[in-house]
Amino acid sequence: MNAGLSRPPRLPEPPGLPVLGHLPPWTVNPLRLLETGARTGPVFRLRLWRPAIVGYRPEWNRAILSDLATFRSRGSLSGLSPYLAAGIVHTDDPQHRPRRRGLSPHFSARALAVTEDRLAAVAQARRPRGDFEALSWSAALVQDMLNVALFGGALPDALLSRFLRPLHHRLPAPMLPRPLVFRRLEAAIAATLADPDPDSIAAGLAAGDAQPGGGQAGAEAVENLRVALAAGYDTTSHTLAWAVWHLARHPQWRDPQALPLFLDEILRRYPAGWLGSRIAARDSVVAGVPVPAGTLVLYSPYLTHADPSLWEDPHLIRPERFTAGQPAWSYLPFGGGPRTCLGVHLARLILRTALTPLAQSDLAQVAGNPAATVGITLRPRGPLHLRARQ
């Protein structure tokens, strides 16, 4: 640790404006800004509303994601959206670790196994037939599957749609407060917690063992379920839409035995969490770069997954690359370290279950624009029109 660092180090940076810095290109096209910055080196500076440093090599990722005491979530970009500025996502150490330990068992692969048959039934019922648009189809399917997994299917569809719909809109829609909708959703979650489906995640949180030594308070359980719903919705539905689009072009990957590698590759090529952020709580040195306290520290799975020094032909869909090992901290579709996405097992289960019925279909791309754009998460620009024949 270095004491007394007061200013960000002199680092390369993409072209910006004298006063506004990088705010205009950040607002218009943040992906292009990141790509331009990456061409200046593996660590670069951005002049946003506060000094920011971006890195994307494994050693940077490891340092930022492993040290929870130095790099903290509160005050970072996740706090800009009311959908994410709550619950475990917005909790730092020393509270984070015990709360995470209490929540993790209810989101584990073992705990989720009891819902697999019900999720498969939902996927089969929404199996596309004829012409369909992948973004709309995946959004409806993932909403239903999250409702089953989290709440046993108890929440009203209309309320879920009203709460989740802004996440599909361009910024600033996901950043705007919606207190009435949030209160109605939280009331519905609280009612579900009072009498939960025994196979749902809500049942585990309601059982009183979601925190060591006492049980999770009702308001905290409601908050964590609301955040899990929002965080899992557009990330998983956008990934699913891309997966179906590319599955139509590469039928050899429809075999259920091949799907895991295919999904790994879709998650690499299109990481929904395209950018992660922390606030430096104290002066530090990361990958040889001094990082003063108060700096906005950014890591980018989007840049890491597109780094040709880590991934050969990174812009191609090549699932077979996952038959070999990858360098540690080079694959971050769900983040990494102690704050790895709590819903990683649920997301993978939903994706695999949603795609399995399509192995029996003849899929064809009709027309669409799969290019990536960003809101809170990475998403296809769309639309993505396909045709499914049985």
Regions inferred by a protein language model and the residue ranges of each:
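Cytochrome P450 catalytic-core helices
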Residues: N224, Y233-P256, L342-S361
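Conserved cytochrome P450 K-helix/beta-meander segment immediately N-terminal to the heme-binding cysteine loop
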Residues: T70, S300-G325
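Cytochrome P450 heme-thiolate "Cys pocket" and heme-binding signature region
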Residues: V89, W274-L275, V289, H315, ...
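Short, conserved phosphate/pyrophosphate- and ester-handling motifs at nucleotide-, phospho-/glycolipid
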Residues: R57, G232, G294, L351
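Cytochrome P450 catalytic-domain helical core, especially the substrate-recognition surface
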Residues: G4-E35, R50-P51, E59-S66, G75-P196, ...
